[in-house]
Amino acid sequence: MAPVRAPTARHRLVARRRLREGGFQTPNGASIQFPLPAYPWQSPLLGPEGNLLIENGDNKNETSGDVDPAKATKADLFPYGVAAKITGVEGRGTGEFTLLVEGVTRIHVEKVIADKAYLEGKVSSYADPALITDSALEELFMSLKLLSRQFVTILRLSSLLPQSSGTPGLSPLLARRLDFYIAKQKYPGALADFMANIVESTYEEKLQILTLIDVKERVAKVIELLDRQVTNIKNSMKITTITATSLPFPMDPDSTKPGKVKPPVKAPGQGVGMPFPPQGGFMGRGGNPDDEQEPNEIEELQKRLDAARLSPEAAKIADREIKRLKKIHPAQAEYAVTRTYLETLAEIPWTATTDDRLGPDTLNRARKQLDDDHYGLDKVKKRLLEYLAVLRLKQAINDDVDIQIKQIEQELGVGSENGKEDAAQPAAVDLTVDEKVKAGGAKLEALKNRRMVDKSPILLLVGPPGVGKTSLARSVATALGRKFHRISLGGVRDEAEIRGHRRTYVAAMPGLVVQGLKKVGVANPVFLLDEIDKVGGSSIHGDPSAAMLEVLDPEQNHNFTDHYVNIPIDLSKVLFIATANSLDTIPAPLLDRMETIYIPGYTTLEKRHIAMQHLVPKQLRVNGLDESQVSFTPEVVSKIIESYTREAGVRNLEREISSVARGKAVEFADAKDSGHPENYNPQLTVDDLEKFLGIEKFEEEIAEKTSRPGIVTGLVAYSSGGNGSILFIEVADMPGNGSVQLTGKLGDVLKESVEVALTWVKAHAYELGLTQSPNENIMKDRSIHVHCPSGAVPKDGPSSGISQAIALISLFSGKAVPSTMAMTGEISLRGRITAVGGIKEKLIGALRAGVKTVLLPAQNRKDVKDLPQEVKDGLEIIHVSHIWEAIRYVWPDGQWPSEHDYPSVESRL
C-alpha cells in the first residue's frame, strides 16, 4: 500500500483498468517478457497490514530524489523493481488516493516502449525456485533463520527502554508473530527479502539486494547485513544474561532511512557503540557518564532517609531497598514501586515530634481555649484538662531525670579519663575507678527506668450530630500546640484502607493512619477518627473494625504494622479522639479499648448563649452585615430555637439565623439603593421571624391556666436531644366493660406504663377512697380512654408512669391537679418511683412552659446538680420515692395513708 501524490485523471484511468484485469501468475524459475506500466513510487515499503515495519512512513526518502510521479520519465526508473497486483483503491478526503498493492515477483526493465499517459515497458520476471537443491544454500538458509530470530529477540527486548531514549522496539505480540513467521518460512529468498527491510542498512544496500537474482547471493548479503548489526550491538554493550531485569540496546530509527546512516559512537573502553545510549545504563549501572539524573535521584533519596532518622529495623530495610534500586533500570515497573516505597519510609515521622506547650500556664491556657471555643460540655473539658495535667507532671519528672542522667554521664566521663591518665598507678586505684564506673552505670540504668512513658488516652466522644465533637478535638490540638488530622471512617468497608495494601498489589499504598502521619509530619499529632460507629463490618474485604483494634490499643499500638510499610510504627504518642453518634454499632472489643465520654445535646439556654456569642456574629460577617445594621435580641433567638428548630446541636439553628440575616441584608440593600436608608429598621422582633422563616414549624406546649380532673402535665425529652417540653396526659371514662383505649401514637413501653398505673390504682382503690369496699372493682361497667396530644408525634418511654397514675386517681376521685405542677418518673407495681433520663432537658422545657412545681424521682437528685442556676431558681423541685408521697404533694388537703401502712409483699429467692 502506498499513497500517491496529486494523481491525474490518466493515472486513475490506468489504475481502474489494471484493477479490472487483475493479477498475473509467474511460473517458478521462469523469465518471461511482457508489457507493464511502471511507477517510480516515493513511499517506503509497507507491510501487508499497511503499517511500517521499522521506519516512519510520513518521512520522505531523501536519497531517492524528489521525483514527481506525474512528471517521471524513463530516466528516473531503476532497472530492477517489483511487479505488484492492485488489490484495491481507497479514496481520501484530501483528493488523494491510496492504492493497495500486493507484490508478486522481482522484475528487470528490459526496454521502455511507451511514454504517454504512463510509462510502459517490457520487463523480465524472476521467480525464486520452490525447492532447495543446493546444500550450501540450505546451510545459508539455516544461518539466516538463526540470525534473524536472534535479531527479532533483541528488537523485542528494546521495547523495555524508555521512549525518550530514541530506541525502536517491537511489541511482544508483534515479535512473537515475526518469530513464528521466520520459523515457518520455507523459502530462503522470501526470508532474505523480508529481513532486508528490517535490518539496518542503507538505501543503496537495499537496491543492491533487489538486483540479486541468485538466491544464494541474496541470502549471503542479508546474512552479512544482519551479522554486521548484531556485531555492532554486542560491541556497544554487554548483554550477559537475558533475565527479567536485563535491558536491550538502543537503535536510532533515523539510521534505517536512506541517506541518514550515522557513524557509530565509540565510548572509552568500548567497541562500536550506538547513536543514543540509554539513560541510566543497564541493570542500574553504566550509561552515559554525563547523565547523572538517576544517580542524583537515588542520592537525594538516601539523604532524605538519613534525615528521617529511621528506626533500626526501618534503616536496615531501607538500605536493602536502596541497593536493589541501584540495580534496577528506571524503565522497569519495579523501579517505581521501590522508589515509592522508599519515599514513603522517608516521609513517615519516625522520631520527629512537636513540643507540647506544657508550661506553668498550661492548664489555664487550655481551659480558656476550650471555654472560648465551646460553651458547656463540662465533662469533656474536665477529662481533657486531666490529661493535660498528667502530661505536665510526667514531663516535669522526665526533665528532672534527664538532668540527673546528664550529670552522671559527665561524672563517668571524667572518671574514665582519670582512670586512663592514672593507668600506671597501683591496681587498688584501678579497682576504685572500676567500682565507681559500675555504680554509676547501675544508677544511670535506674534513672532511665524512672522515665515516664507517655501513653496518650484514646477518647470516644458520643453524642448527636452538631454538638461540637469534631471542633472539640481541634480545640484540644490547639491547646496542646500539636498538629491536627481528621480521618473520616464513615463508609470504610475495606480492611486495607486502615492497614494499607501489600506491596505486591498494583498501585498499593499505605493505610489511612500512615497517610495521616505522613501528612502531619510528626509522631505526636491529634488524630480525629470521625464517625467510628459507621465503619463497615466483616465482609470479603476483611473487617475494618477489627483492624482498628491494634490502632486503638494503648498496649499494642507502639508496634503497629502497616501492610504496605511492613515495619513496626510507634503510635503510642498519637492522641486519638474518636467520635460516634451511637454505641450500638461499635463492636464490644473495640468499644472496650476507648474511654467513652457522652456529650448530650445542648439545652435551650446553651443554644441561646452559643447563638448570641458565636453564631449571630459569624452569620452577620458572612452576609456582609455588622451588629449596627442588624440587632438580634435574646427573645428573637429563643423564638427561633423553640419554634423553628428541634435538634441536639446548632446546625439548623445556624441555618435559620443565616436566613434571617440574608432577609435583613435584602432590606438594607433595597433601602440603600432607593436613597432612603432611614426607612431601614435594624431592630429584629419576634413578629419579623414569620416574614423571613415562614410559619412556625414547632408549637411549644404551654401550661394551662385552669385545671380539670383527669388531666396531668408530664415531662418529655425529645429523642433528637437537647430539647424538652411538657406533655399532657388526658384520661376520660365512659360506661363500658372495663376496656382501656390508648391513642396518641404511643409506644409499647408507654402502653405498658398505663397498664401498670391502672393496676396499682385498681389494687388501692379502697385506700384511695375510690370504692366503698376492698372487693369492689372500680372498672366495673366502666371503660377509660387515655390520650397524649400531638397524635402525629411518636411517644414512648416509661417516664410517664407517675403522671398516668395521678391522672387516673384524679379522674376517679374528681380532684383536679394544679396546672402549674408537672411530674416525671417510672412507677412499679409496688408504687415505687424510679429514676428516668433527660432531667436537664425536661426541667428547662418545664420552666419555659410556665411550670412552677416539678415532682422528680428521688434517685434523680444527682441530676439536679447539673441544672443551670436559673432553672433551679425558677422551679420548685420535689423529690419523691413512692406514689403515696406524690399523692400527698398533689393534694395536700386529703387524708392519705402513708406508705408504711400498706407494705407490699416482696419475694426473695
From Swiss-Prot:
> What is the deletion mutant like?
Increases pexophagy. Sensitive to hydrogen peroxide, and histidine starvation (induced by amitrole). Abnormal sexual development; decreases the number of perithecia produced and enhances the growth of aerial mycelium, the amount of mature spores formed is decreased.
Q: Do you know which Gene3D superfamilies this protein is assigned to?
A: 1.10.8.60, 1.20.5.5270, 1.20.58.1480, 3.30.230.10, LON domain-like, P-loop containing nucleotide triphosphate hydrolases
Domain Lon proteolytic span(s) in chain numbering:
706-893
- Name the positions where ATP binds: G463, P464, P465, G466, V467, G468, K469, T470
Q: Which SMART domains match?
A: AAA, LON
Keyword Nucleotide-binding annotated: yes
Q: What is its EC number?
A: 3.4.21.53
Q: Which CDD domains does this chain map to?
A: RecA-like_Lon
- Residue ranges constituting the Lon N-terminal domain according to the UniProt record: 1-230
UniProt catalytic activity: Hydrolysis of proteins in presence of ATP
- Gene Ontology CC terms, in alphabetical order: peroxisomal matrix
Work out whether the entry's keyword set contains Metal-binding.
no
Q: Which residues form the active site?
A: S799, K842
Query: Which positions does the motif Microbody targeting signal occupy?
Result: 907-909
Q: Which GO terms describe its molecular function?
A: ATP binding; ATP hydrolysis activity; ATP-dependent peptidase activity; serine-type endopeptidase activity
| InterPro entries recorded | AAA+_ATPase, ATPase_AAA_core, Lon_bac/euk-typ, Lon_lid, Lon_proteolytic, Lon_Prtase, Lon_prtase_N, Lon_prtase_N_sf
Biological processes per GO annotation: protein import into peroxisome matrix; protein processing; protein quality control for misfolded or incompletely synthesized proteins
- Name the family: Belongs to the peptidase S16 family.
- Task of the protein: ATP-dependent serine protease that mediates the selective degradation of misfolded and unassembled polypeptides in the peroxisomal matrix. Necessary for type 2 peroxisome targeting signal (PTS2)-containing protein processing and facilitates peroxisome matrix protein import.
Question: What PANTHER family has UniProt attached to this entry?
Answer: ATP DEPENDENT LON PROTEASE FAMILY MEMBER (PTHR10046)
State the protein's name: Lon protease homolog 2, peroxisomal
Task: Supply the source organism for this entry.
Answer: Sordaria macrospora (strain ATCC MYA-333 / DSM 997 / K(L3346) / K-hell)
Gene responsible for this protein: LON2
